[in-house]
UniProtKB/Swiss-Prot annotation:
Isoform 2 interacts with EMD. Isoform 3 interacts with SUN2 and LMNA. May bind to Ran GTPase; has a greater affinity for Ran-GTP over Ran-GDP. The chain crosses the membrane at residues 215-235, 298-318, 323-343, 357-374, 643-663. Disruption phenotype: Knockout mice show significant defects in angiogenesis, characterized by reduced extension of the superficial vascular plexus in the retina and defective aortic ring sprouting. GO terms for molecular function: actin filament binding; lamin binding. Coiled coil: none annotated. The gene is Tmem201. Residues 1-214, 319-322, 375-642 are nuclear. This is Transmembrane protein 201. The modification Phosphoserine is found at residues 441, 444, 450, 454, 466, 477, 480, 529. Residues 578-587, 595-608 have a biased composition (Basic and acidic residues). The modification N-acetylmethionine is found at residue 1.
Amino acid sequence: MEGVSALLASCPTAGLAGGLGVTACAAAGVVLYRIARRVKPTHTMVNCWFCNHDTLVPYGNRNCWDCPHCEQYNGFQENGDYNKPIPAQYMEHLNHVVSSVPSPRDPAQPQQWVSSQVLLCRRCSHHQTTKIKQLAAFTPREEGRYDEEIEVYRHHLEQMYKLCRPCQAAVEYYIKHQNRQLRALLLSHQFRRREADQAHGQSFSSSAVKAPFQVILLRALAFLACAFLLFTTLYGPSEPFTPGAALPPALPPGGNSSAASDNTTSQAEGWQQLLGLLPEHATEKLHEAWAFGQSHQTSIVAVGLLTCLLAMLLAGRIRLRRIDAFSTCLWALLLGLHLAEHYLQAASPGWLDTLKFSTTSLCCLVGFTAAVATRKSTGPRRFRPRRYFSGDSASLFPSSPSLAVPYPSVTSSPASLFIPTPPGFLPLTKQQLFRSPRRVSPSSLPGRLSRALSLGTIPPLTRTDSGYLFSGSRPPSRVSPAGEVSLSDYFSLLSSSFPASPLPSPAPSVASSVASSSGSLRHRRPLISPARLNLKGQKLLLFSSPGEAPNTPSSSEEFSPPNGSLFIESPQLPQRNHTRDTKHTMEMRSMLARDSARSSHSIKKEDESSQSSTCVVDTTTKGCSEETTPWKARVSPSLVRGLLAVSLAVNALFTSAYLYQSLR
């Protein structure tokens, strides 16, 4: 050590360089040792090119691996192509079908709900969004067949992305709840619109019934023209404005001659005194007007007819009255009589003068009535019900505000009306699941309506409160194993109906829709016109007679209409036992015979006890039989009114003829 110290003291630079060299050699040795003893990584984190998800893969497969999220292969060359051939790109049998139904090996996971305001779970909501996006990005193979191809593609997506059973039950329950609210809203809207129409009609009629002043003036002018014609007919060729003129006799000849002459003399003196009060030029004008009118009677009749027609046109359709039309007809008849007299100047018959005088008198009377009665009668109109569709019949609307049913207010926001808050259905699972379904008796009102309104299919005699208008409108449910009750069946049990059938639902029928609304059948109109029913001559036995006891079958009996109007369609299931099928056939035949006998007995009993007329509803619009129809139903009200008008005209004609003969 002493020698080394002496050497370093004699050469300090060499000692420093030697120390640095030793340190460098030691560091290099350590680095080489670490490189030699380095352990290669077993896994590495890679990023998917397609879905951008990070995945941990073995280190050797960092450029050839399948993404577990999108199932796409990631292995590329420098030019961007795949680094190996992929047969699944061009071989169909190597691809598996993509479906939203979870595989059986996946563990059952609890439902994840987005929020309390969304009916669908997170998975079903994502599937709905996917369907919408795929439909939006759809490109047809042929542009001319776009509609057909997109319908097929939509059906394919519906089959691929089906809703889970809880979501399907929730959607059906929500649709039912929404239909109830919208039905009540529509009913309230129709009732308020009817009240508004009635109020508007009353205000409009009160303002429009009063005739305008021009119409009243024209009616008065027509009456004055007819009165002038009547006076010219009474005076004849004489002139009342001459100094020695007298009034026509007011009493018929053959009575007390002295009293009649005294009365005529007093009237002539009074008329002369009245003419003396008028100035001379006024008397001359009256004389000229009288002479002109007496020589132009046909023109005055034409002017009166035109005046009546103009008054009717100015009055309009609302103010048109029967008396105006009758007055116009009388003016037309009077014009025809004057024209006939004008063309028969050589030999004018005596009956023509009598008929002309009678018509003029009647026209004067009718014209005076039309001129005085300036307001149309505003009596209460008889309500004419209208036919409403989509389930809201006119008989549902109350006829008075006191009978109105309280409905939700329409003044609220549109979102709360047409998108109501979905009711909670998960707490309902605590209630009793299995309830005994109600069996409707064939003798009850739904059974009778189902038997009368059947169109050839078997109607279920239970309520189908599933939110659909017809029982066949709901989609067919999937077959479930025995002992398994779905959530949709549970909601159908809560609404007092049968569980969803494992078989496809039948076609929509009117009878099932009638049976679905059995609680309000007395206040609804049928959904189909009676002219289109096919009842094959059966009587519509909706209500039993007072002395008839309701026939309620046992729980093992099923309803079957008689006379073969309906046929039983048994579901086509696999045959298990021939003896069981034979026994079932015998039971069905016995039920058919028993129900037929019961129906014929009820029909015969009702025919004996009922004294009212029965109406047979057929496939055509024939009413009741002619033997039971009263005579008042055959005679229309218009015919009765016409007979009354003819009787009034004949009476007035004979009265005018009598007056004319008496005055002459």
